[in-house]
Amino acid sequence: LIFVILNKNLHVKKLLAAVCISVSALSFAQDYSVPAASPRQKVEQQFSMSKISIDYGRPGVKGRKIFGELVPYGQVWRAGANSSTKITFGQSVNFGGKTVPAGTYGLFIVPTEKEWKVILNKDFQQWGAYTYDPKQDVVDVTVPVNKLADKQEWFEITLNPTDENTGNLVIKWDMAQAEVPLKPSKLDTVIKISDKLKEIKKIESDSTKKS
């Protein structure tokens, strides 16, 4: 009888141990995920009187020939990896010389050896460029491609300000880099509003100091 009881107790202990291990494994799985081959990145930056945000996948070179092979020349590319790249403008902007209303767009590129056509498309919720429809294009601009001095291993999109109201959308990967100039669609109006806001803030600051 004692042997039976001990056996039962041992069985219960093993069962409890198995449950504890399962719970711990589940908790670990909830906190961690499998490393992504092409990590997703979100970039948000102040631009003029609002913000610009970009959501994109970052594939690596990994010893491959990129432009002209992995990314064929003359074909629409998702400008990243996995789901299409999304760019959101908080205000109407001048995108490489063309007006784009505030909103979210899919960002695509048609690369050639010497220049890239950078496209903003209404459909920003597709996988890759498999369902890309040129009829949904909002604007496209063609910009020159520059050769980098050092290889860019991971695909990267950045926003580089040139002053408080203008900047460049910089896209680079492997040995190639292209830039699209950005500014508010109504720069004169934005500057006037900005100057007026600065005047108001100065008056408020002076008033606070006097009191």
Tell what function each PLM region has.
Residues L1-Y32, S207:
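Bacterial Sec-dependent N-terminal signal peptides
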Residues Q30-P101, G106-S211:
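Targeting-peptide/extracellular-domain and disordered-appendage signature
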